[in-house]
Design a protein with these regions (language model features):
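Conserved PLP-anchoring active-site segment centered on the Schiff-base-forming lysine
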Residues: 109-129
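Helix C-cap/helix->beta junction micro-motif
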Residues: 27-30, 131, 193-194
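Short acidic capping loops at alpha-helix termini that bridge into adjacent secondary structure
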Residues: 87-93, 112-113, 164, 222-223
Length: 292
C-alpha cells in the first residue's frame, strides 16, 4: 500500500513534553520517585469557586456558539482591557480547547512565515510545520534575558524578507527559560515599522513574581494576537479551556479561524465554559499569590 501519511505530517513526532509527562506517570506507578521538569502542570488545585461552578453546570449538554459563550468572551475582553489597556471586544474573542489549539488554528490559516526566538516552547515549530509555514529561528543571548533586541529582530526581518507575511511568536514569561521580556516596547516599534503580526503567548503572564502583566499589545495592539487560558494560573490544564484575542484589523482573518473551528472541534465543552465565566469574573488575587 502506498504511504498513507502526508509528507508534512510523516516526520511529526509526539510533543516531547507530553511524552515526558506520560513517562513520568508510568515510573510513578512503578513506585519510582520522579522530579518532573517536562510539563507545565500546576501542583495547586483549581480555585474552589470555579470547581463548584463546574459542578453546578455538569448537567449542561447543549452545543454553544462556535466562538464561545458570550458571557465568557465578555469577561475575557474585560480581563484583557484591565491588563493591557486595549479593546479586544467579545466579538474578537475565540474560545478554544486550550491556547495550544488557538495557535494551531492561526498556523493552519496563515499564509506566510514564522519568526521564533530561541529558546522557545517545543510545540511552536511543529505547529508551524503542520500549517506548512516556514520557520526562522532568532537566536537570543543571556545579556538580553533570552529575548531578541530590536536590532536583532530587524536584522532577522530583513534577512527573511521584509515584504513577506510574517508572524513573530513572543512568549513572556518564557517557556522554557522563565524569563520576562523587558524590551517589549522596543520590539513593538520594529514590528510596527515592518507591519508584521505578533502572536503573544500569554499563558504564564498572570504568574510573574512582581504581579505585573506585561503584554506587547500595550504598545502594538493593531496587529497583536493574544492567547491565554486556564492551564497555568488556574491550574486547570486538563480542562482544556483557552482563548484567542484577535485585533480589530484582522476581523476577516478571524472568520477563517471560526470556519476551521467549526469543522474541527465544533465548540469547547459546555460545562467548562460556564465554569470559566466564574474564572474570568474575578481576580482571584489570594489564589494567584499562592501559586506564583
Amino acid at each position: 500500500m502506498k504511504n498513507l501519511t502526508k509528507t508534512s505530517i510523516l516526520n511529526l513526532k509526539q510533543s516531547s513534553t507530553l511524552v515526558i509527562n506520560e513517562k513520568c506517570k508510568e515510573l510513578i506507578l512503578k513506585g519510582k520517585k520522579v522530579y518532573q521538569f517536562g510539563f507545565g502542570q500546576s501542583p495547586f488545585p483549581v480555585p474552589e469557586t470555579i470547581v463548584n461552578t463546574l459542578k453546578k453546570n455538569a448537567h449542561r449538554k447543549e452545543y454553544l456558539p462556535i466562538q464561545g459563550l458570550p458571557e465568557l468572551r465578555e469577561n475575557i475582553s474585560n480581563y484583557l482591557a484591565k491588563r493591557t489597556g486595549n479593546d479586544y471586544p467579545k466579538e474578537n474573542i475565540l474560545i478554544t480547547p486550550g491556547s495550544k489549539e488557538a495557535m494551531l488554528l492561526i498556523h493552519i490559516a496563515f499564509n506566510g512565515e514564522i519568526i521564533i526566538p530561541a529558546p522557545g516552547w517545543v510545540s511552536y515549530e511543529p505547529q508551524a510545520e503542520i500549517g506548512s509555514n516556514k520557520v526562522h529561528w532568532l537566536e537570543t543571548t543571556r545579556e538580553n534575558n533570552w529575548f531578541p533586541t530590536g536590532k536583532e529582530l530587524e536584522k532577522k526581518i530583513k534577512s527573511v524578507g521584509k515584504n513577506k507575511n510574517l508572524i513573530l511568536i513572543l512568549n513572556s514569561p518564557n517557556n522554557p527559560s522563565g524569563a520576562v521580556c523587558k524590551n517589549l516596547e522596543e520590539l513593538a516599534k520594529v514590528a510596527k515599522k515592518y507591519k508584521i503580526m505578533v502572536l503573544s503567548d500569554e499563558i504564564y503572564t498572570d504568574l510573574t513574581f512582581n504581579n505585573e502583566y506585561n503584554s506587547i499589545s500595550k504598545f502594538y495592539p493593531e496587529l497583536s494576537f493574544i492567547t491565554g487560558g486556564l492551564s497555568k494560573w488556574c491550574g486547570a490544564g486538563g480542562w482544556r479551556l483557552g482563548f484567542l484575542a484577535v485585533p480589530k484589523k484582522l476581523t476577516e482573518f478571524l472568520k477563517s479561524l471560526k470556519s476551521l473551528a467549526s469543522e474541527s472541534y465544533s465548540t469547547v465543552n459546555t460545562p467548562t465554559q460556564y465554569a470559566s465565566v466564574e474564572a474570568y469574573a474575578h481576580e482571584h488575587n489570594l489564589y494567584k499569590l499562592k501559586v506564583r
